[in-house]
A protein has these predicted regions:
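Long, charge-dense, solvent-exposed interaction surfaces that engage phosphate-rich ligands
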Residues: 1-26, 31-34
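Helix-rich C-terminal "collar"/helical-bundle subdomain used as an assembly and partner-interaction module
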Residues: 24, 33-152
């Protein structure tokens, strides 16, 4: 996928640089929240081909949805972005990135607390089912994604 002629654009560079798992999960979450399940499936397929495991995908997604829920609850208490960064940093025992909070505030705005709690519950249950080997992990992960989309 390298360009052999013409001017190299920033998009060409972006396409040539592999995305981090975090970036891919962020994209997947955005697609999921927009109900674009086919695009989500394609991205998950690509991640599986890259050797990413469902348990790892769930762990990163859980982190993202927990952050959404935390910033939504703190924002509802009237806390500013800076106060949220400070509260989460204290709670987690590590410095939380301000941009992560800013994007989480923006992305969680249209989501209900009930939806976020339900999504976290679905991901935790799916993680448990995969780890206990009740059913095929690909099937369980796909089912979790469908449940999340249908609860939006």
């Amino acid at each position: 996928g390298y360009k052999t002629e013409g001017i190299i654009s920033s998009q060409d560079i972006a396409e040539a640089i592999p995305k981090s798992l975090q970036d891919n999960i962020f994209d997947m979450t955005q697609l999921l929240l927009r109900g674009q399940i086919q695009s989500v499936r394609e991205l998950v397929h690509d991640l599986r081909l890259q050797g990413e495991d469902e348990i790892k995908l769930i762990a990163v997604m859980l982190g993202q949805f927990r952050t959404y829920l935390q910033v939504k609850l703190l924002s509802a208490q009237g806390k500013s972005e800076q106060q949220i960064v400070s509260s989460l940093s204290d709670c987690l025992g590590r410095k939380v990135n301000q941009f992560q909070v800013r994007f989480a505030l923006r992305d969680s705005r249209p989501l209900s607390v009930a939806f976020l709690k339900m999504t976290i519950k679905i991901l935790v249950e799916t993680d448990y089912q995969i780890k206990t080997g009740t059913l095929d992990k690909d099937y369980l992960f796909d089912l979790a994604l469908l449940k999340i989309v249908s609860n939006r």
